[in-house]
Amino acid sequence: MIARRIWRSHRFLRPFSSSSVCSPPFRVPEYLSQSSSSPASRPFFVHPPTLMKWGGGSRSWFSNEAMATDSNSGLIDVPLAQTGEGIAECELLKWFVKEGDSVEEFQPLCEVQSDKATIEITSRFKGKVALISHSPGDIIKVGETLVRLAVEDSQDSLLTTDSSEIVTLGGSKQGTENLLGALSTPAVRNLAKDLGIDINVITGTGKDGRVLKEDVLRFSDQKGFVTDSVSSEHAVIGGDSVSTKASSNFEDKTVPLRGFSRAMVKTMTMATSVPHFHFVEEINCDSLVELKQFFKENNTDSTIKHTFLPTLIKSLSMALTKYPFVNSCFNAESLEIILKGSHNIGVAMATEHGLVVPNIKNVQSLSLLEITKELSRLQHLAANNKLNPEDVTGGTITLSNIGAIGGKFGSPLLNLPEVAIIALGRIEKVPKFSKEGTVYPASIMMVNIAADHRVLDGATVARFCCQWKEYVEKPELLMLQMR
């Protein structure tokens, strides 16, 4: 009866139907084989797992297929499904459940981080957690089992099974405390690991008890103070303990790259294979400064913070309308240039989790106020490591606002498959000469455009930059052509 119910759920989700379970559509891979060798107890394999999104704006995902099931016992393996195009593995951040917990359909099971975003994985089945296969911090490949669920009436007997039997079925059994993990970012967890600290014993001072970098360093200092005291005592008795302790503080450390940092390695490595050229220009931002001040003085919404960036983004979109090849991508296999219909302008953001480039969709159809609100939303999500996969995919051109941190000149690398990226320097007052020879102060910003020389030539980029510069220096021209 249990097997029939499980099979009905598979038939409902699969694109084919069958009247029996005796003929699986795919060969069972070796890594799915269980301890039992009898045909009756051998699990069958269904279609490769994919993700389905539950709810229009939700960031929760679930696997629409169990990778392997045991029809005799009611065990279902829930795999890590495909979290996005080109994603082969994810880092497990934390568990929302522990072994023995009851779970409902669409209940969050865990949170994982791919190269592009942080995603909650939810349960497709109702049952109890029989086995958790990984701990926070583990790198899990797509298709590997995340958790084993006991479904229907067999769950009570499964959860009372001897622990050694469960280990044989699904791998090593972890302690509940280690599996749940502390609420923190990958960078903070790696820092704690490098310092030899169990992050679960640290009291977090961040939002919702999140363990921050400062918490780890503070805990490390306290631990180091105690260690130093002990070392000093040994130094009096033993002689050379102090020098041994001092030398150990300067040992090499290996820091694994995770999440966005790992994605940056892949993207920048690919970028080195593309022929770049750079075009540098100065833009007078006096009018931009006045416009920002006007918006600030007439702002009636306290939740909106006006900056230079929305106007730069909108003026960039207006220039792209006249030079569509700058808003394109290149297909090296077919030697074709794909002109993008939408202006999805990405903005590079440096966060404590790494560099991420979310993009504002359809800028050509948005007002300055709408761009300001969307930019604020993306910045908030990026700071909290909550960007959706849709927010970081589909970009057509990128702005890197290095001037917000410091520096007036940058030399960016392409964010493939885009063909252009623009580094914005700091706006600063410098002396300039007028046509009459008098000196006057001007707010100048240096911009550096990196372009794919397979698609764009110097003349095209120069004309494009001059058009963008004109819109920035004379924002009233935007009013003539805005739709």
From Swiss-Prot:
Induction notes from the record: By dark treatment (at the protein level). Induced by the calmodulin antagonists trifluoperazine and fluphenazine in darkness. Down-regulated by sucrose in a hexokinase dependent manner (at protein level). Up-regulated by Leucine and its derivative alpha-keto acid (KIC).
Expressing tissues: Expressed in the non-photosynthetic organs such as siliques, flowers and roots.
Identification of the protein by name: Lipoamide acyltransferase component of branched-chain alpha-keto acid dehydrogenase complex, mitochondrial
Listed cofactors: (R)-lipoate
Cofactor annotation comment: Binds 1 lipoyl cofactor covalently.
Function: The branched-chain alpha-keto dehydrogenase complex catalyzes the overall conversion of alpha-keto acids to acyl-CoA and CO(2). It contains multiple copies of three enzymatic components: branched-chain alpha-keto acid decarboxylase (E1), lipoamide acyltransferase (E2) and lipoamide dehydrogenase (E3). Within this complex, the catalytic function of this enzyme is to accept, and to transfer to coenzyme A, acyl groups that are generated by the branched-chain alpha-keto acid decarboxylase component.
Alphabetized CDD domains for the sequence: lipoyl_domain (cd06849)
The organism of origin for this protein: Arabidopsis thaliana (Mouse-ear cress)
Transmembrane segments: none
GO molecular function, a single term: dihydrolipoyllysine-residue (2-methylpropanoyl)transferase activity
A Gene Ontology term for the protein's cellular component: mitochondrial matrix
Transit peptide: 1-75
Keyword Cell membrane attributed: no
Catalytic residues, chain numbering: H453, D457
UniProt KW 4Fe-4S keyword: no
Quaternary organization: Forms a 24-polypeptide structural core with octahedral symmetry.
